[in-house]
From Swiss-Prot:
GO BP term, pick one: translation
Protein name, UniProt field: Large ribosomal subunit protein uL24
Gene that encodes it: rplX
Organism (species): Agathobacter rectalis (strain ATCC 33656 / DSM 3377 / JCM 17463 / KCTC 5835 / VPI 0990)
Similarity section: Belongs to the universal ribosomal protein uL24 family.
CDD domains recorded: KOW_RPL26
Length: 103
C-alpha cells in the first residue's frame, strides 16, 4: 500500500467526476481503499428508518467517499501534484509545481 499524498485537513480541488472544479476540505482519509471524504463534495441522499437512537428518521444528506486520484491538493491557491522527499532524516511532502515543502 502506497503512502497517501493527501491528509486530513488539506484543501483539495476535484478534477474528475460530477463535482469537477469544486473545492473542499478533507474530512477523513481511508488509505486502505484510497478514498477521501471531502466536505460538501459527492453528496448523497440517505433514507434512515426511525430507531431508538434516531427517533425522527427521514432523509439525510451526507458526503460519500471519492477516490484520491480524482482530487488535487491546493497549495498557494493553485492545484498541484504532490511528491515526497527527504528533509534531513524526515520524509516530507512538497508541491511539485513550486518545490516548496507542504508540511
Amino acid at each position: 500500500m502506497a503512502t497517501m499524498k493527501i491528509k486530513k485537513g488539506d484543501l483539495v480541488k476535484v478534477i474528475a467526476g460530477k463535482d469537477i472544479n469544486n473545492e473542499g476540505k478533507v474530512i477523513a482519509v481511508n488509505a486502505k481503499n484510497n478514498t477521501l471524504l471531502v466536505e460538501g463534495i459527492n453528496m448523497v441522499t440517505k433514507h434512515t428508518k426511525p430507531s431508538m437512537s434516531n427517533q425522527q428518521g427521514g432523509i439525510v444528506h451526507q458526503e460519500a467517499p471519492i477516490d484520491a486520484s480524482n482530487v488535487m491538493l491546493i497549495h498557494d491557491g493553485k492545484p498541484t501534484r504532490v511528491g515526497f522527499k527527504m528533509d534531513g532524516d524526515k520524509k516530507v511532502r512538497f508541491a511539485k509545481s513550486t518545490g516548496k515543502v507542504i508540511d
